[in-house]
UniProtKB/Swiss-Prot annotation:
One of its GO terms (biological process) is mannose metabolic process. It catalyses: (2R)-2-O-(6-phospho-alpha-D-mannosyl)-glycerate + H2O = alpha-D-mannose 6-phosphate + (R)-glycerate. Its cofactor is a divalent metal cation. The active site is at D126. Binds 1 divalent metal cation per subunit. It comes from Escherichia coli (strain K12). This is Mannosylglycerate hydrolase. Keywords: Glycosidase, Hydrolase, Metal-binding.
Length: 877
């Protein structure tokens, strides 16, 4: 009799390092479970495989306390029995950056090679939805297979669990969906009644959905020890289901069967974030916004600032500190695990997540300062007071720069490398204790104070490089006064901005004549959800600052003006007060709106003082545009999403596990457009948005979501059981202060032609400044060589392709440059001009393995497809 299906039983564990329990609690279980796993693999030849959840952080946690077992692990990996990798941690894919996903795979696969070969499957059994760019990233590591659970439904193009999945550039993987999850084979009973009760309905679903009738029954669960009697269970399965064949397999064997039927597979494209058959938690992007903001800020510091700066320094002769960078990367990658960055954890775990981010940020800040200092210390005029300006974007930038200089003088002159005076504006000045500069000064009895000047300058800084200004103490400088010709509260060549009575803004784009009104109005509403999902209260009451009485202070400086808008919102203290239409709670709002004299951007800092619970705060940016779609960036590209999800009309009748609310994630920017005119909103960490309004559309950017439970049952937008467990998490109410920032950019034409992606990256990559003075708390010896006073490593146009990463190669003396095309539909070429002679240029995989022959020069062949990244390795003279 031909088998109805072949059922592949794969022993595994899903290992959340932390969740409602801490890493240290799970580590104790890990030590226990690993001993059982190793003993079974060593002693039982029939127990062929064990999958270690696709992440090497498990091994790192284990070896921290059991280093003596490295050889035991290595033997089992080399034998193909213990299956490890390819990830470092089980990452989220919708709210972390492209480079974070790339480094997660890079470090995970490099860790694997110390023990054997990694599993070459993009294995994400529990992440909350799948980015449409994952096939492209997987291919960059030679991975052509993926296995996941969440996000698919038949509206993507098939109701089958096996298909081909493509990214926008055509990168392709073979996909196997786990339609009932990764734990349907957990704790399998050994008796017939128990097995039939569990599996009869499962087999019907699995076989109906399968093209190949190769069925997966993963034998494992969260923190589950291996099932000792699995062979007894398999014998019972063969007895009660004789029409099916049961085998112990590794996932690769299933994919071999799928790939043999490639011609029968549908081809799907795009992201998978449907919660029809399983929960994807579309609104988890706004939980614990303090952590989300820190995460984005530190990602940007490492990728946009530190790595390019370290590369500049390396090309000048200084050491590239791979070990320090790997340490900080791994700290934040631990936080990128889906539960951790989703922030659906206990308060104690969230405190540990914050601590890891603080450690990584402290390392990044100090290493940035170290590299700037090494460069400044080793210029020809090394003892002179200097201000060194670093531009880590690949085109020259004229920027208004706010920075601080310290010196032992009450006045100073600032000059450039040609001896010309540099005008500057003094924003603030204060005395500081000399011990804060260098404790050795006061150690020898010198207590004369230093002066600290916060200054503003307007300078052009070379592309991917730096320039030096010189500080002459006790000399009169070209100090200029504040200027303003504004008719409204703020004005420059591009914008006229006025204040409404409720504290919101009226904007006029002078070039296009387009008007925007009620911009930056704060909206407050209920949140009866949990750490996984937003859900409104049954008795909703939406409040805006319409009755606020704002106080507005205007500060005009030399090249920049700011409006500081302050007001309080009276809001319900909790859900009970909202139901009773009472409002004894309070949200303090301080908006700082900054307009530079030569900028199309309006930069906004939002400072909140939240003194209420169970609510959501959003900032609204109304536009005059009537459109049914919105553009947002994603990893290595951008995509258009509908303003409204049509599935919302019938989601309850169709039995969705959660409502398909049109609340989406971005990474750095989102844009609305009608005709040739558009408005983009840039953000750092505010990665959740919705577009609301009937005709004229409004951006609604989530600022804060306060909830008090990790999991909660029977939400309006997510009926049924709690996600996670019903654990109190008072810290997730986010009482107290929260600061965030965004920027508004108007443009004409397409987002691609206007360089919206490039402008967002530039906003997230501010010019860095280093003030070199003769004293420093920490001493450094000088290098045995000098560096130039001005330097530019490379140059690219401010449109077209965009840099994703600039770093030194991990294993050779070359520069790695990863570029991508951010456009959704247009191809583009890349032009890179190095200031140094290029001995050779090779194209590589994302793992930095060379794939093409070396070419002389820096010319890059062929156009970049939409959403395509390419990685190049340069050997410089």
């Amino acid at each position: 009799m031909k088998a109805v299906s072949r059922v592949h039983i794969t022993p595994h564990m899903h290992w959340d390092r932390e969740w409602y329990f801490t890493t240290e609690e799970s580590r104790i279980l890990l030590v226990n479970n690993m001993e059982e796993i190793l003993c079974r693999l060593e002693q039982d030849n029939e127990y062929k495989y064990y999958v270690l959840d696709g992440q090497t952080a498990i091994l790192e946690d284990y070896f921290a306390v059991k280093p003596e077992n490295k050889d035991r692990v290595k033997k089992q990996v080399e034998a193909g029995k213990l299956i490890i990798g390819p990830w470092y941690t089980q990452t989220d894919t919708t709210i972390v950056s492209a480079e974070s996903i790339v480094r997660n795979l890079m470090y995970g696969m490099r860790d694997c090679l110390a023990f054997g070969e990694p599993m070459k499957i993009g294995y994400l059994p529990d992440s909350f939805g799948m980015s449409g760019q994952l096939p492209h990233i997987y291919n960059g590591f030679g991975i052509t297979r993926t296995m996941f659970w969440r996000g698919c439904s038949e509206r993507h193009g098939t109701d089958k669990t096996e298909f081909l999945w493509q990214s926008s550039d055509g990168s392709e993987v073979t996909a196997q969906v786990l339609p009932l999850g990764y734990a349907i084979g957990k704790y399998l009973p050994a008796d017939e009644n128990g097995l039939r009760k569990r599996l009869d309905s499962y087999f019907d679903v699995l076989e109906k959905a399968s093209v190949t009738k190769e069925i997966l029954l993963p034998n494992g669960h969260d923190q589950m020890p291996l099932q000792q009697n699995i062979f007894e269970v398999m014998d019972k399965l063969r007895e009660i289901y004789p029409q099916r064949k049961f085998v112990m397999s590794r996932f690769e064997e299933v994919f071999e069967k799928i790939e043999a039927q490639r011609d029968n597979l549908a081809t799907l494209k795009g992201e998978f974030i449907d919660g029809k058959y399983m929960r994807v938690h579309r609104t988890i992007g706004s939980t614990r916004m303090d952590i989300k903001i820190a995460h984005a800020r530190i990602e940007n510091k490492i990728v946009n600032l530190l790595e390019p700066l370290a590369t500049l320094a390396w090309t000048l002769g200084f050491e590239y500190h791979h070990g320090l960078l790997e340490k900080m990367w791994k700290e934040i990658l631990k936080n990128h695990a889906h539960d951790s960055i989703g922030c659906c954890c206990s308060d104690k775990v969230h405190r540990e997540i914050v601590a890891r981010f603080e450690l990584a940020e402290d390392m990044a800040d100090n290493l940035i300062r170290f590299y700037m200092r090494k460069i400044a210390d080793n210029m020809p005029q090394s003892d002179a007071d200097k201000l060194v300006l670093f531009n880590l974007m690949p085109w020259p930038r004229e920027e208004v720069i706010n920075t601080t200089v310290r010196l032992r003088a009450s006045q100073f002159n600032l000059r450039d490398d040609r001896g010309q005076p540099v005008p500057y504006f003094i924003r603030h000045a204060r005395e500081i204790d000399p011990g804060l500069i260098d404790r050795q000064i006061v150690h020898y009895g010198n207590y004369d104070p230093f002066m600290e000047f916060d200054i503003q300058i307007n300078q052009i800084v070379p592309s991917m490089g730096y320039r030096t200004l010189y500080i002459e103490a006790n000399q009169p400088g070209n100090v200029i006064a504040a200027k303003s010709d504004a008719e409204g509260i703020l004005e420059n060549a591009f914008w006229q901005i006025a204040l409404n009575e409720d504290g919101s803004l009226q904007l006029v784009d002078k070039d296009s004549g387009v008007r925007y009104d009620r911009v930056l109005q704060i909206e407050e509403s209920s949140d009866d959800g949990d750490e996984y999902d937003y859900s409104p209260a049954k008795e909703e009451w939406v409040i805006t600052a319409a009755n606020a009485k704002p106080q507005c202070d205007i500060i005009h400086e030399a090249w920049q003006s700011r409006a500081v808008i302050r007001y309080d919102m009276a809001v319900p203290l909790n859900l009970s007060e909202r139901s009773a239409r009472q409002s004894t709670g309070r949200v303090g709002v301080v908006l700082v709106v900054t307009l530079s004299h030569n900028s199309r951007r309006i930069d906004v800092d939002i400072n909140l003082d939240n003194q209420a619970d169970d609510h959501r705060l959003r900032v609204l940016v109304p536009t005059p545009f009537n459109t049914d779609s919105v553009l947002a960036d994603t990893q290595f590209g951008s995509l258009t999403r509908p303003v409204n999800d049509s599935a919302m009309n019938n989601w309850q009748q169709e039995g969705w596990k959660e409502a398909p609310v049109p609340v989406w994630n971005m990474l750095n920017y989102v844009a609305l457009q009608e005709g040739r005119n558009g408005m983009a909103v840039f953000s750092e960490g505010l990665r959740e948005f919705e577009v609301i309004g009937e005709e004229k559309k409004t951006f609604a950017i989530t600022l804060l979501r306060g909830v008090g439970l990790l999991g909660k049952e029977d939400l309006l937008l997510r009926p049924g059981r709690p996600s996670g467990i019903k654990m109190p998490v008072p810290d997730s109410q986010l009482r107290g202060l929260l600061s965030c920032r965004l920027s508004l950019l108007s443009y004409t034409g397409t987002p691609t032609a206007a360089g919206v992606a490039q402008q967002a990256r530039a906003w997230l990559t501010p010019v860095q400044c280093y003030n070199k003075i003769p004293w420093d708390v920490m001493k450094l010896n000088k290098a045995g060589f000098n560096v130039p006073e001005s330097y530019s490593l490379l140059k690219m146009p401010p449109v077209g392709c965009l840099i994703s990463a600039l770093k030194k190669a991990e294993d050779r003396q070359e520069v790695i440059l990863r570029l991508f095309n951010p456009a959704e539909s247009a191809t583009c070429d890349a032009t890179v001009a190095f200031s140094r002679e290029v001995i050779s240029c090779s194209e590589t995989m994302m793992d930095e393995h060379i794939t093409t022959e070396e070419n002389q020069g820096s010319n890059l062949s062929g156009p970049f497809l939409p959403g395509q990244s390419r990685t190049f390795s340069y050997r410089l003279a």
